[in-house]
Amino acid sequence: MFENVKVKMMKGYLFLEYPACGTCRKAKKWLDGQKVNYTDRHIVEERPTREELKMWFERSGLPLRKFFNTSGLLYKSMQLKEKLDGMSEGEQLELLASDGKLVKRPLVIGEDFVLLGFKLEEWEKVLLK
């Protein structure tokens, strides 16, 4: 549970990405250009656990629905837009944990924040303070 705190203290932030994703590559290039210290994690090969997702969701203050990659083929093929409203929080967390491609990316996880998706102004405000 506290491994992310350790990552922050030792190696900067936790950056979750899918290398084939153009937005993730753009975000990573920006992080490197700004000399932001982070640990990289492939979101599909080392997918987030239910516990991690619950912790990040609570830390973010965002609705859980925002954690879904609504642009992804898997999300669309599973017709999740129609199904999520009928699912409990626990069911949604289990679903997110089942496949990293369902999770919105990239993510940057800090001790007291979660950045979801690459929004330059938000990233500058949080990471360059």
Language-model features, listed with the residues they occupy:
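Thiol/selenol-based redox catalytic cores and closely related redox-interacting motifs
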Residues: E45-K129
